[in-house]
Amino acid sequence: VAKALLEFEADKLRLYPDPAALELREAIAAAVSIPEHPVAADQVFVGVGSDDVLALAFLTFFNSKKPILFPDITYSFYDVWADLYGIPYRTPGLDERFRLKKADYLTENGGIIFPNPNAPTGLMENLDTIEEIVAKNPDSVVIVDEAYVDFGGVSALPLVDKYENLLIVQTFSKSRALAGMRIGFAIGQKKLISYLNDVKFSFNSYTMNRLTIA
């Protein structure tokens, strides 16, 4: 980061940044790819921090009259966005071990979101649980908020190839210690990412500045 800032050509600040942030998306795709599960740049969506990405995801995917589902103990902004966008929601309780009760997420819904690890509890759901929730909700987008995944646990990124309704959201603010750069990103299949871009570009094409992209 320091090297990129030192080498940045200040004269470029007179120009608008790339609205698609292609170089940044290519770099993120390369960073999260593994040989068994490569990620392409067009599977990456970037925003000004993960809150920006999550808010756009709520606006894009949670537009049914059916309630969305998220745990009662969870990231505190989920209900804020739901209320802001007029999205009905239900908040199933956690079990006695403070983990998701899988059966609660296999009911009719307009979408699902949960943090993994859960921000307040620090507990991680295993991939089998996540996959079952995603697989049994083929008509709903399931968002896994992995803001803290690097502090312990396994990412659900390997499931993206298999499920077109799965969106993974991560951030540069926590384990990468770059909160001041305001970079959040989502990984999903190309079609899902294209829907996010359609909404984003409809009202704000330039969400990231040139220094951040550098």
Spans of features found by a protein language model:
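PLP-dependent aminotransferase-like
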Residues: 60-115
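Active-site phosphate-binding strand-loop segment of PLP-dependent enzymes
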Residues: 95-150
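PLP-dependent aminotransferase class I/II
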Residues: 19-20, 165-214
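N-terminal small-domain helix-loop-helix segment of the aminotransferase-like
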Residues: 1-49, 56
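Catalytic-core regions built around general acid/base machinery
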Residues: 129-137, 158-162, 195, 199
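Short glycine-rich anion-binding loops that position phosphate/pyrophosphate groups of nucleotides
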Residues: 1, 50-51, 75, 116-120, ...
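Short acidic capping loops at alpha-helix termini that bridge into adjacent secondary structure
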Residues: 37-44, 65-67, 146, 164-165
